[in-house]
Amino acid sequence: MRLLIAIALALAVAAPGVAARPATAPVTTHHRAIVGGRAIDYDATFDEQVLSDAAGKPQATISGTAYVRTGIVDRSKRAVTFAFNGGPGASSSPLHFSAFGPRLVERWGSGEAPSIRDNPQSLIDITDLVFIDPVGTGFSRVLKGGSGQPYWDVDGDAKAVLGFIRAWLKRNGRTGSPVYIAGESYGGTRLAEMVGDADDLNLAGLIFISPALGNEGEGSDLDYVFALPSMAVAAVRNGKAGAGGRSVDAVFEDARSFAMGDYALALMKGSLLPDAERDRIAARMSALIGLPARTIVEHHLRVDAETFRKALRSSEGLVVGRLDTRVTAPVPKHEPNRPSAANDPALGLGASNVIISDAIGAYMRNELKVPIDRPYVSLTLDVNFKWTWPQSRGGAAPSLTANIAKAMAAKPRLRLLLVGGYYDLAVPLLAPRYALDHAWLPMDRVEMIALETGHSAFEGEQGRLEMKSLMRTFIKE
């Protein structure tokens, strides 16, 4: 689950021996947006920080953009929401410019003219917003003679994010404000890691969006159990399995019941599974996920996401998206040194390892008056490939749900919102649900929502409408 696109926050202030000082001086501009049919005035502030090592040598920069509504009499009671995606190697651009932020950037590719408009579903009317890009993404960068490696691992990254949040709250006189933190994809790992050390924050809500919450199923039969319901809805959507008049939710739930019942029991038997039972399970799987029973048997009933998305529409010369199984594209040319997930048609990476957004760069320079000429990096696999994973876990993302349980036990009013998409095979919907179900959380303060979307759960106009409704309720409860 390493290549999970999304968004990030960071600033290494809390890490021992790490100091931060301004690079580009903070820039504040004043704006008005129409949100929910009302005019909302707000200040936008871009801030870049230099991260230094224990000896004081500058290593890299972290940058963030804050949107603060003006005209508020008592800011101590107004919520502030910090949002980040993941990757690792993803900027905050998806949540910033496609979901929560006051402006939408609707064209992303290099060479395209900016297409920017107000976001009528922005959260700026109900909460102040802070979007931060980690080292190597957005306008953030590794400095000459420095290194991003201290911030390109689970622990260093989380310390950097938590340090940024503390510094921002203190600098802006908001330590008493209700704090909400939203992490998407690997951002869920980041959020779960850092809340274990966030007792000093006035945390009100944790928002996990298509989160990678750890390695509960990684390398085990649980991987296949988690993926099967998402494969079932993908097969129906792609015309390879029948819905029988059922809703997406009903298709998912029927497949979930089978996956966690007969299917899981069959996998547990391993090579001791009788042939007759194997064939019965394979036939049921075939009806659910649209692959031939023979193919399923050849894989010992264990069909992973990559096998599924390549096989589902192979007769048409198409591969199905990983981040969004509703998206298809012609089978790409085989590149032995390139991860299959990098060729995901729902990712839009093309032959490069980097997505540059000219539109976002132009917005930052022209509207927010940011005096930076370098490109805005929306996503870079170069950071992803350099990420250091805990070797004690075989190079996998750690399981961090105990941190969430600890935080919720320490803060009796802290609530959690989990949002996922039915069409997400990068983080199948069942995986984070299972992780939270087994974290011994106070479930009366936990809400789990499934949307008819892919990995970017709030993408598109309908996604933003659903997002605004969910977030308005969650933040104001």
Residue ranges and their predicted role:
Residues 173-185:
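Alpha/beta-hydrolase fold nucleophile elbow
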Residues 209-210, 216-226, 291-476:
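C-terminal subdomain of alpha/beta-hydrolase-fold enzymes, centered on the catalytic histidine
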Residues 183-195:
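Glycine-rich nucleophile elbow surrounding the catalytic serine of serine-hydrolase chemistry
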Residues 105-106, 195, 199-289:
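A catalytic-pocket lid/entrance helix-loop region that shapes and gates access to the active site
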Residues 124, 134, 151-169:
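Alpha/beta-hydrolase active-site loop
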Residues 56-150:
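N-terminal cap/lid subdomain of alpha/beta-hydrolase-fold enzymes
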Residues 5-14:
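Bacterial N-terminal signal peptides
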Residues 25-71:
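N-terminal cap/lid segment of alpha/beta-hydrolase-fold proteins
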